[in-house]
């Protein structure tokens, strides 16, 4: 993660709950009294984590303009996951739901997609190592804690990884405006990976050709597309709905 910094109450709480050894020190807005913040600071103190109080300008400088809610933590880098970790992830789920992002380069969108994936119960988010947003502090802040708990798998060859998933029985559906049927008339149950492409460009050709099926979100108004994080949430939760029937 860029600068090994995480911003905001949710992100710090998530690291504290899941991997507290990553926490090095925490910077808190001086004289801030907050019902959400005080219990968190107590937990951090109990673990012996250094807490430094700083003025707003100092925190703003550390956050480089990003919203920080008065708390910033310096952390050790999280473990980097790759295609070799997918076997372990899949073995831990009988009916896995995965999200694949192809060409999503905006950290805000990555963070929002991670949050959507966590809320929908996905077991992992897969992105290519190249032509993809990195897990910056901004992405982590937007993810609202999900970046610290959702496995983010970076792969060298996305199409090859998709074929490996298919060999393990994962059905892969890609979203495309020219698809012949929509998400509400598509089977989204069973082991499943949903592929979302970049806004405007969509999925790359090889990614599209590797999908088992193409689906679309029906659009009733004048706009032709949705923000990728919004579209991701719609697709993931339609899969969640179908799995509960």
UniProtKB/Swiss-Prot annotation:
Keywords assigned: Cytoplasm, Methyltransferase, rRNA processing, S-adenosyl-L-methionine, Transferase
Subcellular location: Cytoplasm
GO molecular-function terms, A-Z: RNA binding; rRNA (guanosine-2'-O-)-methyltransferase activity
Classification lineage: Bacteria, Pseudomonadati, Pseudomonadota, Gammaproteobacteria, Vibrionales
Gene source species: Photobacterium profundum (strain SS9)
GO annotation, cellular component aspect: cytosol
UniProt xrefs under CDD domains: SpoU-like_RlmB
EC number(s) per entry: 2.1.1.185
Catalytic activity, as annotated: guanosine(2251) in 23S rRNA + S-adenosyl-L-methionine = 2'-O-methylguanosine(2251) in 23S rRNA + S-adenosyl-L-homocysteine + H(+)
Protein name (Swiss-Prot/TrEMBL): 23S rRNA (guanosine-2'-O-)-methyltransferase RlmB
HAMAP family: 23SrRNA_methyltr_B
């Amino acid at each position: 993660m860029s600068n090994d910094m995480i911003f905001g109450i949710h992100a710090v709480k998530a690291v504290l709950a899941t991997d507290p050894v990553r926490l090095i020190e925490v910077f808190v807005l001086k004289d801030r009294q907050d019902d959400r913040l005080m219990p968190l600071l107590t937990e951090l103190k109990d673990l012996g984590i250094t807490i430094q109080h700083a003025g707003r300008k100092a925190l703003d400088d550390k956050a480089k303009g990003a919203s920080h809610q008065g708390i910033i933590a310096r952390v050790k880098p999280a473990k980097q996951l790759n295609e070799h970790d997918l076997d372990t992830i899949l073995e831990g789920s009988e009916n896995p739901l995965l999200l694949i992002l192809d060409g999503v380069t905006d950290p805000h969108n990555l963070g929002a997609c991670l949050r959507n994936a966590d809320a929908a119960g996905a077991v992992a988010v897969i992105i290519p190592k190249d032509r993809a947003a990195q897990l910056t502090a901004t992405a982590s802040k937007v993810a609202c804690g999900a970046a610290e708990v959702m496995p983010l798998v970076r792969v060298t060859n996305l199409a090859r990884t998709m074929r490996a998933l298919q060999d393990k029985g994962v059905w892969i559906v890609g979203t495309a405006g020219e698809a012949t049927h929509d998400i509400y008339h598509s089977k989204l149950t069973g082991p499943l990976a949903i592929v979302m492409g970049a806004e405007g460009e969509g999925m790359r050709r090889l990614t599209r050709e590797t999908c088992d099926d193409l689906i679309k979100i029906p659009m009733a108004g004048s706009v032709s597309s949705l923000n990728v994080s919004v579209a991701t949430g719609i697709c993931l939760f339609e899969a969640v709905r179908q799995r509960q029937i």
